[in-house]
Amino acid sequence: MSKRTVKVGVAGRFGPRYGVTIRKEWSEIYKQKIALYTCPSCKKKRVKRVANGIWQCRHCGYKFAGGSYTPAYEIKVVEG
């Protein structure tokens, strides 16, 4: 079998569709979304995403709001 996901990782499921740049960007965001993060309450690396902006620790059950793809979201200021 061919190695379809060498360049783009999990975005290989899209095949040749959508272009390589969009697939690489989607792959990076998807990896951030499914990664385990450190709980602010018990300090264990067991936090998973429940829904958009909702995160829950699988060890202590602590549920909190955060960013869409990572628990700690960044606020960017645009000067214009």
Swiss-Prot record:
GO terms for molecular function: large ribosomal subunit rRNA binding; structural constituent of ribosome; zinc ion binding. Keywords: Metal-binding, Ribonucleoprotein, Ribosomal protein, RNA-binding, rRNA-binding, Zinc, Zinc-finger. It comes from the Archaea. A zinc finger (C4-type) spans 39-60. Its cofactor is Zn(2+). Zn(2+) binds at residues 39, 42, 57, 60. Binds 1 zinc ion per subunit. GO terms for cellular component: ribonucleoprotein complex; ribosome. SUPFAM superfamilies: Zn-binding ribosomal proteins (SSF57829). One of its GO terms (biological process) is translation. Binds to the 23S rRNA. Belongs to the eukaryotic ribosomal protein eL43 family. Putative zinc-binding subfamily. HAMAP family: Ribosomal_eL43. Part of the 50S ribosomal subunit. PANTHER family: 60S RIBOSOMAL PROTEIN L37A, LARGE RIBOSOMAL SUBUNIT PROTEIN EL43. This is Large ribosomal subunit protein eL43. The gene is rpl37ae.
